Amino acid sequence: MPKQKTHRASAKRFKRTGSGGLKRFRAFTSHRFHGKTKKQRRHLRKADLVSSGDFKRIKAMVTGL
């Protein structure tokens, strides 16, 4: 059976944390900030962890993580 290839787009978007989680950055941060409040923009700057439901799927796509 051939080796499973790493999904390159996913490998660039997720990083492993020290405790074993997956770090991701938030969506809606590239443009159209005039429609968002200052609080929304501030919260969008922070990274977040991948939810437990998505963790298994992403881990399978990115074999090196």
Swiss-Prot record:
Stretch list, region Disordered: 1-21
Q: Would you tell me the Gene Ontology cellular component terms? A: cytosolic large ribosomal subunit
Output the GO biological process annotations, alphabetical, semicolon-separated: translation
Family named by the database record: Belongs to the bacterial ribosomal protein bL35 family.
Q: Entry's Gene3D superfamilies?
A: 4.10.410.60
Full protein name:
Large ribosomal subunit protein bL35
Record's InterPro entries? Ribosomal_bL35, Ribosomal_bL35-like, Ribosomal_bL35_CS, Ribosomal_bL35_sf
Q: Which residues form the signal peptide?
A: none
- Note the Pfam families from the entry: Ribosomal_L35p
Q: Which organism is it from?
A: Streptococcus pyogenes serotype M18 (strain MGAS8232)
Spell out the SUPFAM superfamilies in the cross-references. Answer: L35p-like
